[in-house]
């Protein structure tokens, strides 16, 4: 992802408009830049310790109920909040760490990475992307996704 792509994402977020459509477009741009087929953005309800799906691209329809609400500490997105940093998997289908829940394996995703969305130093959500093939996102790709997470921070309300 080049600086121009970050600028493009920033521009989409600054344009405003309908929040769900804006987040969906930003997610689509991020996925294209990182050659990914699936993506989710979750907003954190820190009081209830739940992540709520606010945008997704590429998930099978039957998975939407599974990822609609995720408790902090559960699954890849929930673990991202607990760690306060990235969670990556080379192949979600063969993961034995216990982080990827059985339902997540139904997505067909191989490589995956999820990072916090921050407003300042406060985690306000997560952004996760994945690909259908076995793939380990590089530290550079993860770092760029974290930059996007900071851009998204003010867009989650």
Regions found by a protein language model. Name each.
Residues 117-127:
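Short hydrophobic/glycine-rich mini-motifs in sensory/regulatory modules
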Residues 44, 50-52, 61-94:
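Regulatory sensory and allosteric helical modules in signal-transduction proteins
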Residues 126-136:
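Short beta-strand-to-loop transition segments that serve as allosteric relay/switch motifs
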Residues 110-118:
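A short, aliphatic-rich beta-strand micro-motif
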Residues 1-21, 32:
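Signal-transmission linkers at sensory-effector interfaces
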Residues 146-154:
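Allosteric cytosolic regulatory segments
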Residues 50, 60-63, 90-111, 131:
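Signal-transducing coupling segments at domain and membrane junctions
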Residues 27-31, 37-43, 78:
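Short, hydrophobic-rich beta-strand element in sensory/regulatory alpha-beta domains
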